[in-house]
Amino acid sequence: MGKVFFFVLMIAIIGSTFLIEEALGSLVGCPRPDFLPSWNRCKSCVCKNNKLKCPKILKGSLLKTAA
């Protein structure tokens, strides 16, 4: 019972951190500053309307760049 509660608590903490970071990101705009956690910054980001857009990486294009 305690393990399940701890697991749910961790998910809630991670989720709330992500929401807080989203709010911070929308406040500071684009590009994202380094103090925000790395999961919300991607290496090849495009700014559109002051929002960060991360391109979807397709397996085919990934294979072409590797070859």
UniProtKB/Swiss-Prot annotation:
Sorted alphabetically, the keyword list is: Disulfide bond, Secreted, Signal, Toxin
Claim: Secreted is one of the keywords in the record: yes
Entry comment on modification after translation: Contains 2 intrachain disulfide bonds (one per chain) and 1 interchain disulfide bond.
Query: Where is this protein found?
Result: Secreted
Found in which tissues? Expressed by the venom gland.
Example GO molecular function:
toxin activity
Q: An example Gene Ontology cellular component term from the record?
A: extracellular region
What start and end residues bound the annotated signal peptide? 1-25
For this chain, the family text in UniProt reads:
Belongs to the ant myrmeciitoxin-01 family.
Q: How does it assemble?
A: Homodimer; disulfide-linked.
- Designated name of the protein: U-myrmeciitoxin(01)-Mg4a
Q: Which organism is it from?
A: Myrmecia gulosa (Red bulldog ant)
